[in-house]
Amino acid sequence: MLVLFETSAGFALFKVLDEGKMKSKPVDINNFFETPEKASSFVSLKKFYKFDGTLDALEAQTAIAECKVPESLSNFLKKNVVSEKLNEQLIVSDSKFGNAIKDALNIKVLCDDTTQELIRGIRLQLKSLVNANEQDLNAMSIGLSHSYSRYKLKFSPDKVDTMIVQAISLLDDLTTEINIYAMRAREWYGWHFPELGKLITNHTQYANAIKAMGNRKSAVDTDFTDILPEEVAEEVKEAAQISMGTEISPEDLDHIFALCDQFLSIQAYHTELTEYLKSRMEAIAPNLTILVGEIVGARLICRAGSLMNLAKYPASTIQILGAEKALFRALKTKHNTPKYGLIYNAKIVGEASLKNKGKMSRVLAAKAALSARFDALCEVSDTSYGIAYKGAVDRRAAAIEGREVRKSLNAVKPEKSGNVAKYDHTKSATTNTTRDVATKSSKESSIKQEKQDVKMEEASSSDSDSSSDSDSSEEEKSKKSKKSKKEETPVAKEEKKEKKSKKEETPVAKEEKKEKEEKKEKKDKKEKKEEKEDKKEEKKEKKDKKEKTEETPVAKEEKKEKKEKKEEKEEKKDKKEKKEKKEEKEEKKEKKEKKSSSKEDKKEKEEKKEKKSSSKEDKKRKDRDEEPEEKKSKKSKK
C-alpha cells in the first residue's frame, strides 16, 4: 500500500510497511504514531517531490481544490507508480480527488475512515518522517496560504457584496425597531399628555420634547426652540395647561426617558448606517446607484444574493424582483402578472403617473440590468454609463408622460377639432387585431359568394332532371305517413297517456318549483348577509393594522378570538349545508315514492277499465249468440 500526502513544500509518497495493521480499528491506528520510532516502523518515505517555488505550489493547490490532477503530480505518480508497474493501492485524503487520479492515471485508490486516521498520524509525525526543518515548513505553509487567499479574493467578487447585503438587511431591521419604540413611547406618554401626539407627528421631535419637558406641568417653563418651531411650541404649552391626561409618577417618567434615549440612539445609528451604505454602493456599484438610488440598488443586490448574480439576471426578472409571491399567485390563478417589484420604490417610477408606472419600470429595469453588468464586470469603476442611462430614462419618461397621437397606418383617424386628443394606448393596442379581422371577413365573404354562384348554376342545370323524381317521392312520403298514423302500436298509446297525465299534474309541479325558488332566495340572502359581515370584519382589521404597527398582547388575543369565531361560523355553515343536502335528498325520495304510487294507481285504474271493457264485449257476444237461437226456436214453433 502507498500513501499520497500533500504538503506546502511538495508531494510525499509513503509506503506502508505492515499492511496487517490496516485491518485494525481506526481508533487503534493512533497508537502507531505516538512516537517517531513507532511511526517510522509503520510507514516509510519512498519518494518526495519538492515544489520549485510558491507559484508552482499555488498552481498545484488550486488544481487539487478543484478536484483536478496537476501536471507535477501526474508526472510524479507516472514515474514512481505507473512506470514501475506497481499494483498496490494508493491511499488519498479526499475521495473526489482520488476519483480524479483513478480516471486520469488508472490507479487503484482507497479512501475510508482508517485511511483518514493514517493520514492524520503522518501529519502529526511529518517532520521526523520527511527529515525536514520545522522553520522551512512553516515558511512554505505561510507563503502558500497568503498567495492562495489572494487568489481566492481576486477571483471571487461576491465576497465584496456581503457588506451591502448585511447593511441593507440591518437597516430594514432598524426601521422596524424604530417604529416599534416610537409607538410604544407615544402610547406610554399618551396617558399623561394625549394631546402631544396630535401636535407633533415626527418621532424624533416627540422623543426630544418628552426628554426636555418631562411632566406636562413644566411645559410652560421649558424651552422648545432647538426641538420645535415657535408655533408648535406655543400650541404644546397651551395644550399642557388644558390636558385631559392622568397624573404620572417620577418612576414612570424615568422608564419613559430610558425608552426615549434608546430610540434616539437607534435613530442616530440608523442615519450613520445609511451614510455607510451610500458610500459602499458608490464604491461597488456606482452606475446602479446613479440610476436607481443606493437603497433600491442595495435591496436588488440583497434579493439577488450578490452583484454578479444581479448582473446575470435579464431585465424582465429585475423588473419583477421582490414580487415573486404575486407572480406565482397570478400564474396559479391565471390572472395578470405583476408589472413591478422592488424597482417600484425608485424615484423615476414613483414620479410617473399611475397609468405609466408599468412602462417606466420596464424601461428602468432594462437600463439597470446594463448598469449592473458594467459595475460587476468592468475592471475600472466609471460613472459615465450610469449618467448616460439616467438621461435616456429621463427623456423616455418625458416622452411617455407628455406624448401626442402617433401617425400610423393602423391608428384610427381622429375627428377634426381644434384640440389635439391625447394618445390612448388601449385603442392603439387593438388596431392591428381589428384590421386583421376586417380583412379576413372581406376575404371570407368573397369566397362564400363564389361558392354560392357555383351551387346555383349546378342546381339550375339539374332542376329539369329532378322535377319528376321529386313529385313521385312526395307522393310516397304522404302514403307512408298515413299508414304510420293508422298503425299505431300499443306502446305509442301508453306514451300518449303518460304525456296527458303529466299535463294534468302541472299545478303540483308549479307548487314544487315555487318552493324550490323560495328556498334558493333564502339561501342567497343568508350568503349575502354573511359576506357583508365578513367584509366589515376585514375592514376593521385593516384599520387596526394601520393605526398600530405593532401587535399588543390584547390585539393578539382579539385576533385569536376573531379566528375562533370565523372557524365557528365556517363549521356552522358546513353543518347547515349538510342538513340542507339531507333535506333535499329526503324530499327527492318522497317525490319518487309519490310518483311511483301515482303510477301504480293509474295502472290499477287502467286495468279496471280494461276489465270493464272486456266484460262489456263478452256480454255483447253472448247477446249476439242468444239472438239467433231465439229466432230458430220461433221458426220451429211456426
Swiss-Prot record:
The keyword Coiled coil does not apply. Residues 284-402 form the Nop domain. GO terms for molecular function: snoRNA binding. Disulfide bonds: none annotated. SUPFAM superfamilies: Nop domain (SSF89124). Keywords: Nucleus, Ribosome biogenesis. Residues 437-458, 485-521, 527-574, 580-632 have a biased composition (Basic and acidic residues). One of its GO terms (cellular component) is small-subunit processome. It comes from the Eukaryota. SMART domains: NOSIC. It is found in: Nucleus, Nucleolus. One of its GO terms (biological process) is ribosome biogenesis. InterPro entries: Nop56/Nop58, NOP58/56_N, Nop_C, Nop_dom, Nop_dom_sf, NOSIC. Residues 416-638 are annotated as: Disordered. Belongs to the NOP5/NOP56 family. PANTHER family: NUCLEOLAR PROTEIN 5 NUCLEOLAR PROTEIN NOP5 NOP58, NUCLEOLAR PROTEIN 58. Involved in the biogenesis of box C/D snoRNAs. Part of the small subunit (SSU) processome, first precursor of the small eukaryotic ribosomal subunit. Could function in the small subunit (SSU) processome, first precursor of the small eukaryotic ribosomal subunit. During the assembly of the SSU processome in the nucleolus, many ribosome biogenesis factors, an RNA chaperone and ribosomal proteins associate with the nascent pre-rRNA and work in concert to generate RNA folding, modifications, rearrangements and cleavage as well as targeted degradation of pre-ribosomal RNA by the RNA exosome. This is Nucleolar protein 58. The gene is nop58.
